[in-house]
Amino acid sequence: MTLHVKAAGIAFAAAVALPMSAGAAELRMMTGPQGGSWIPIGGQLKDIWEKAIPGSKFQVFPGGGVANVRGIQEGKAEVGLANSISTADAMTGRAPFNKPHTDVCNIASLYPQYFQFVVLADAKINKISDLKGKSLTTQQRGNTGEVITRHFIEAHGLKYSDMKVSFVGYTDSVNQMKDGHAVAFGLNTQAPAGAIMDLQAARDIKFFEQTDIYKEMLKLNPSYQMITLPKGTYPKQDKDLQVIGFFTHVVASCKLPENDVYTMTKSIAANTATLATVARDVAKLKPPAMAADIGVKFHPGAAKYYKEVGITVKTN
C-alpha cells in the first residue's frame, strides 16, 4: 500500500480567544535531539500554550520519539512530541516498550515524518548489503529514528554487529558523514530535513528507496506506511521516492486537566501559521487531520475540542 500524504485544507486564523485555565502550572515538555526539527517546534508550542493558559510555564527538554513516551508514562514529563508508530507500540507494550503505557494520550497529529536513508555517493554502496564492514551513523539508542534504522538494516538481512554504528545527534551524524567517518546515515524527520540539506551542501549523497523491503518492515512494525517524498524536496532529487512514513503528533499525560488540554488542542488549531514557520507541513493543518485515528487514545480534553468542531474521537 502506498500512501501519498498531503496536508489538508487551509490554516486557521492565528488569533482566537481561548478560555482561561483553572489549573495553571509548570509543565515539562520533551522534544527531540539537537539539530532536529522538534526542538524549534517545542519552542513554538511553549510560546503558544503559555499565552493561551494564563500563568502556565512550559519547560522544553530534548528527547526522542521513544524516550518521550516513556518519560510521560514514568512521570518525567507531562507533554511531548512523538511518532505514531512508537506511541502505538507503547499502547500494547510492543518492543521497545516492556509493558503497556496507559498514561499516554493523543492530543493532535501535526505532519508526516519520512524515514530517509542516505549514503555518500563515492562510497560504492549500491545495495544495503554493501554496508557490511562499513560505518553507519544514526540517532541515540531508543530514538525512533534509531529503531527504524535498525529495522531497515534487519529487513535487508543485516545486523548492527555487521558494521560500525554511531548513535549520536543529527549534528554529529552530519559531521561524521562530511569527514568520511560514516558512509551511511539513517534518520526520520519532516522533509526537507535540515540535517540532510547541511550534508548535501558539503557532500554528494544518494537516497535509498524503500519499496523493496516494505513487507519485511511491516513484520517488524505493522504501523509502518509507504509515503511519497516528492521530487524536488532536495536538490538533484529528480523523481518521487517511496519511503517508510508515519506521523508526528503531540501527546500528554492522561492525568492532565481536561480544560487545559482542551485549550492546548484548540490553540494548536488556531496557530498553524505560527507553527508552520518551523514545520512547513503544518501550514494547511485542519482539525480532521489533527484528529486522525493513529491507534492511540485521545485525551478527554482533546476530544472535547474535536467534538466542538464536529469530530468524534476515541478516548479509550
Language-model features: where?
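Pocket-lining segment of extracytoplasmic ligand-binding domains
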Residues: S84-S86, G93-A95, A123, K159-L256
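Bilobed "Venus flytrap"/periplasmic-binding protein-like clamshell domains
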Residues: L27-A52, S56-Q59, Q113-D179, A273, ...
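Bacterial N-terminal signal peptides that target proteins for export
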Residues: M1-I10
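Sec/Tat signal peptide C-region and signal peptidase I cleavage site
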Residues: L18-A24
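Ligand-binding clefts/hinges and TM-proximal coupling segments of bilobed small-molecule sensing domains
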Residues: T138-H151, Y224-I294
